Amino acid sequence: MSDQSMSVTLLAIESSCDETAAAVIQDGNILCNIVASQRIHEKYGGIVPELASRAHQQHIIPVVAQALLEANIQKSDLNAVACTSGPGLLGALLVGVSFSKAFASALHIPVIKVNHMKAHILAHFIGDVKPSFPFICMTVSGGHTQLVIVRNYLEMEVVGETQDDAVGEAFDKTAKLMGLPYPGGPLIDSYAKQGNPLAFPFPTVDMPGYNYSFSGIKTAFMYFLKKNTAVDPDFIQKNLPDICASVQHALIDVLMRKLKRLVVDTGINRVAIAGGVSANSGLRKAMEQKREQEGWDVYIPAFEYCTDNAAMIAVAGYHQYLENDFAGWDLSPEPRLRIGGGL
């Protein structure tokens, strides 16, 4: 293990999807967290990989420069560079990985490859309130829906995951069916606050064990809209809050049922959520209800750490640095990188 009595300063880079981000961490404390988001994808109704990688190329140097400036850190102060190696979009990851390798090589310091999904989980170690090990984390995003047992900073086991759509993808697809712009998930959440979650029931599929399925809800929702708009073309407009509240309720119900099953089966009542969908107010409320009704120790990330950011990459990279977990110079992007163990 590295000598922790010495100051350890890392630059972290995140470029897995449509945010170009950089952060600086020193002795476990985040000094800055810079994120450049890409608005160009909205008119296409989803992420366009080629446009994403081009935008990363435009943003990465100014974002890193801004991070070093805000942290008041010189390049010579850095001990290593941590970067997201996967999962994510190949072209987007390539920009961050290539920059990180070149930057680290020029400074004669090591590069650390970070698993993006592990980093989402470790975002819980940024603030003052941190979970104790072991704990359960439900990772919920546009690309992933997983139940993970977190044993320490480096050891995690996936015990359940979606067998089709990720929950964030289900939110965006149902929003698109209603004619809402991309990204639709936050819009559903916003409209749902004024609606009745029990107005329109949707069938859900109970997969074996801790696995998830959301495609059934999406299909049922499509036929629900088709049937009702055939009778009244203005059905969606007239009932938008109730429709949004109902579909959100169905999706969250699926998430929480499996999460509760895992808590009961393992006896681990320290429970966290992570990933973009952890910003959803309905999910956050459901977690708070479990805290109040069933005594769970609940950990909900600050909004700025729900979506992709480099601070979480910095935390993961810092703990890997302490264990001398460095990558070779042959490091390449791993678009389908998984959390180890389990499934």
Curated annotation (Swiss-Prot):
Its EC number is 2.3.1.234. It is found in: Cytoplasm. Substrate binds at residues 139-143, 172, 185, 189, 280. Its cofactor is Fe(2+). GO terms for biological process: tRNA threonylcarbamoyladenosine modification. Disulfide bonds: none annotated. It comes from the Bacteria. Fe cation binds at residues 116, 120, 308. Its main location: cytoplasm. One of its GO terms (cellular component) is cytoplasm. Keywords: Acyltransferase, Cytoplasm, Iron, Metal-binding, Transferase, tRNA processing. The keyword Transcription regulation does not apply. It is an enzyme of class 2 (transferase). Belongs to the KAE1 / TsaD family. Required for the formation of a threonylcarbamoyl group on adenosine at position 37 (t(6)A37) in tRNAs that read codons beginning with adenine. Is involved in the transfer of the threonylcarbamoyl moiety of threonylcarbamoyl-AMP (TC-AMP) to the N6 group of A37, together with TsaE and TsaB. TsaD likely plays a direct catalytic role in this reaction. This is tRNA N6-adenosine threonylcarbamoyltransferase. It comes from Cytophaga hutchinsonii (strain ATCC 33406 / DSM 1761 / CIP 103989 / NBRC 15051 / NCIMB 9469 / D465).
